[in-house]
């Protein structure tokens, strides 16, 4: 913590597909003990290798969608943002999960990772050989921490936050190999936030996959939904 510049932040990437839930809890417990201000974010862009990130700072962490929109007018920054699928500030808003105040009670009794007790050094390699359900279980733990309140991002459109739970549900369905459930969850996300870039991109990708597989009817149905008002799936 003392190595950060004033207002500086530290980001710890979490490869959920390589972490058992116990290891994830140990990391969160240690991180929230060190940093007074913490946020948990997740990436769920239809990936079989889901990622999360813990962001910590000595001072409150602020995100500003309007500032990001201004930076997106810079062609260099825009190209970089598009490279990671983040060319809309609302892409950022739907990735927010929760803050340290909500995480600390969950991991209060979980031992810290320390230099003399480097738990992850010994437990993480086990995941390499026992990967079934690994990413799904860790992502489910993260999803259970979802704060129902809008993400603390100034200038972001509140409606997009309503899609977060459904986007996580879709990612969990993908990891479980449940295509129909994944599709329903993305349709529900789009119904909650029709402008959601994440939901629209995922549905467009699913439509392309279904078309390549010869399921033209489903592909056409998704394409029609993307071009019309959307209702939640039944």
Please identify what each model-predicted range represents.
Residues 193, 210, 229-230:
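Alpha-helical junction/boundary sensor with strong preference for TPR arrays
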Residues 173, 207-210:
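Residue at a conserved register position within TPR or TPR-like alpha-solenoid repeats
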Residues 7-14:
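Conserved beta-strand signature within the Rossmann-like core of class I S-adenosyl-L-methionine
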Residues 40-188, 193-198:
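Soluble small-group transferase modules, centered on the S-adenosyl donor enzyme superfamily
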Residues 169, 203-206:
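Structural register within alpha-helical repeat arrays
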Residues 22-42:
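Conserved Class I S-adenosyl-L-methionine
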Residues 1-7:
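A short glycine-rich, Lys/Arg-flanked "PGG" loop and its adjoining helix->strand segment in the class I
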């Amino acid at each position: 913590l003392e190595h950060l510049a004033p207002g500086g932040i530290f980001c710890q990437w979490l490869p959920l597909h390589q972490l058992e839930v116990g290891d994830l809890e140990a990391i969160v417990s240690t991180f929230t003990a060190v940093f007074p201000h913490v946020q948990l974010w997740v990436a769920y862009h239809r990936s079989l290798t889901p990622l999360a990130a813990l962001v910590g700072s000595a001072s409150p962490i602020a995100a500003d969608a309007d500032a990001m929109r201004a930076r997106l007018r810079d062609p260099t920054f825009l190209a970089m943002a598009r490279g990671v699928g983040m060319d809309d500030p609302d892409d950022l808003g739907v990735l927010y999960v929760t803050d340290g105040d909500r995480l600390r009670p969950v991991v209060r009794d979980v031992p810290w990772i320390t230099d003399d007790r480097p738990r992850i050094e010994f437990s993480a390699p086990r995941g390499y050989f026992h990967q079934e359900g690994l990413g799904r279980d860790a992502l489910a733990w993260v999803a259970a921490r979802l704060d129902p309140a809008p993400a603390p991002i100034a200038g972001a459109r509140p409606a997009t936050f309503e899609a977060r739970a459904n986007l996580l549900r879709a990612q969990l369905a993908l990891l479980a190999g449940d295509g129909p459930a994944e599709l329903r969850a993305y349709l529900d996300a789009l119904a909650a936030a029709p402008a959601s870039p994440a939901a629209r991109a995922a549905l467009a990708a699913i439509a392309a996959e279904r078309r390549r597989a010869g399921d033209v009817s489903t592909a056409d149905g998704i394409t029609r939904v993307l071009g019309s008002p959307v209702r939640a799936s039944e």
